[in-house]
Amino acid sequence: MNMPFLPGEKKLLAFSVLLIFFSATAKYTFGQTLSINDSGYFEKPGVNILVFNSQYNGMFFDEKTAGIEIIHHGDRTATGGAVRLQNTPEQWDLIPKLVSRKVDKAANTIEVAIKYEEFDFTSRAVVSAKENGIEITVWLDKPLPQKLESKAGFNMEFLPSAYFEKTWLVDDKPGSFPLYPSSNTRIESSDKKISQFAGHNTFDDRGRGEFIIPGPLATGRVIALAPEDPEQFIRVQSTDADIMLFDGRNLGQNGWFILRSLLPSNKTGKVLTWFIEANAIPGWKRKPVIEFSQAGYNPSQEKTAVIELDKNDAPLKSASVFRVMADGKTVERWKGEVKDWGRWLRYNYAKFDFSSIKEPGLYYIQYGDQKTNTFPIDTAVYSDIWHPTLDVWFPVQMDHMEVNEAYRVWHGAPFLDDALQAPVNSVHFDGYSMGPSTQTKYKSLERIPGLDVGGWFDAGDFDIQTASHCTALLSLVDASEKFKISRDETFVDYPTRYVDIHRPDGKSDILQQIQHGTLNVVAQVKFIGHPVRGIVVPNLHQYHHLGDASDETDNLPYDPNLKPFEKTSHSSGRMDDRWAFTGRTTFLDYFTTAALAAASR
């Protein structure tokens, strides 16, 4: 039954509908036009777009920190905007060299030229502020080289963790970002693959001469990423090419989600246009970040917190320190002045001194509506924070040993097939290389005996770096001598190559670690004649290994007389044994001498 409106009810209803509409859409607006700031990138509140402010480097290649990038509501969620040669480039795929970069603030345009020297292929990208986003146009002065047809395309990569459990619309067709990679792939012959750095290969094809090509999750002309999330909503559209959405994690766990359009063959001039809009929440400012010692403070030391602020934010006049009591209540113990420090790079900074608090207890800092986690103030605050480093971290890094902790085996005994002489005139990865001489009595790929003992893994990798060993040995000796450390929480048994964490064995752990690091360095000097740059796996598909260190090689010494992947009880035809890069330097000789002299004490 229809009920008549009372006087004024229609106006009230209309107002209510408008209020609901504007409340629902207040966080969804592509907002004002981007403009180039004094730092040379596009900016508006909530959105920064960088155009090759950072370049690809020749050490670790694609580190996801170069090309056209988007910092979206304080988080860098897009990177790698550039012409690339693969659907989902891996870290060691070829990277372009920046030839030129021109910033025209008056025209609100940034132009870059990049070149793949391996193919004598140069492209230009012109990035211009347009309406509420940016327009990217790709220009070619010469047609694509034939080898790059159906391979060269414009890519932009998006951080997976920012889009997990979110959705997309591709030409209005819905989909969702997968938590685990699950898109289609296909196999192609290796002769169709563009070579990676120095001819190395990230893919272990088991001798089949093939490689993987990921297929797209979706394809269309207009792609909306996370349209339901005002902080992550980005829309990308093209009028002259399809845009494909890929999952880079099919090839590497460090892969990102990728948008990509192929460049056309036999065409010059403007060959591709993208228009990108990143949603900007009106009035958005990055929340203050309070930086302090999470380990805590000694009562007598200076205590200063650093407060990092949005460039459009100004420091509050004061901050407070609250003490957490045993009954769960909190009491304000100090309210002090916040002093403006100034601007550095992207942020404003302020300092908050609370050195006057000397009473032991648990505290937190309150700045506006931001609150830190709890930290202690106590005379013994630093007395045991080093225990996890000696108890767990160092044992886990122990090479050539099985390492156990309670129910967990961190890794089996690895690299029992160490090591082969690195071949001359070889360019390796991770900075390793060999010149025209081995500077040893060993020939290229000849076995060097006695190196399967002692040492630690390098940070993040499973290679041995001798200079890092020397630094660690000197630090451990210094700590042992100054602080008389006798802590014993690690069981080490060399006859069985076994380490057990949290299990005392009656010996000083720090002395055991000094011994373990020294063993490998001494073996180098004994069997090679001098300390070496390092010992590392020969294949790139081994180097990015993320599993148990003992699975990076087969632990069987390489025998060139066996067929590839053929094994006996004591040898293998698989060329996976680590290589010793034996170039000699005066610096490393003296550094090692100092470390061994210290360890001998």
Q: For each predicted feature, which ranges?
A:
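Beta-strand-rich N-terminal accessory domains
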Residues: 30-83, 183-213
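Extended, loop-rich substrate-binding clefts of extracytoplasmic carbohydrate-active enzymes
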Residues: 84-143
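Acidic (Asp/Glu-rich), glycine- and aromatic
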Residues: 135-181, 371-381
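Low-complexity, Pro/Ser/Thr- and charge-rich linker/hinge segments at domain boundaries
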Residues: 162-170, 283-302, 372-411
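Beta-strand-rich recognition/accessory modules
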Residues: 207-284
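Ligand-binding face of N-terminal immunoglobulin V-set domains in extracellular IgSF glycoproteins
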Residues: 289-318, 322-326, 331-380
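Well-ordered alpha-helical scaffold segments within catalytic/enzyme domains
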Residues: 305, 367, 473-503, 520-527, ...
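Active-site lining segments of carbohydrate-active enzymes
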Residues: 453-459, 523, 530-601
